[in-house]
Amino acid sequence: NQSNGQNLTNTFLSQGADVILPVAGPVGLGTGAALEANGSGTMIWVDSDGYLTTDYGSLIITSVMKEIGAAVFDSIQEQVNGSFSNEPYVGTLENGGVGLAEFHDFEGQVPQDVVDRVAELQEQIISGELVIESPNAP
């Protein structure tokens, strides 16, 4: 909840954190409120482009996005084509199911070597050169 997000963020800030990645829906709103109240720190949003969907855009470096629209589109297209299956859908960089939002207000503040490295890692993941595995994958 928002209160937990605010409390946890205040704890992280007191421990020297300067970037917070809240992962749990409304917790991010509490994080934004805490960052705003403290006048320091930034955050990385989750699920959607928080810059566009919250009041804390000026605090959001980027967002780790679930591109649910891609999954919905693919499912509808499979149904129309008669190829729909009940196999679990896993959103990946390759199938457009996940991604990073733009840096928006932080565009000029993120060092170019970091931007380049992130792009390089994304390309390596998509090509299969860098394999990311999870024991929780379906």
Region locations from a protein language model:
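A residue-level marker of the well-folded mature domains of exported/periplasmic proteins
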Residues: 1-138
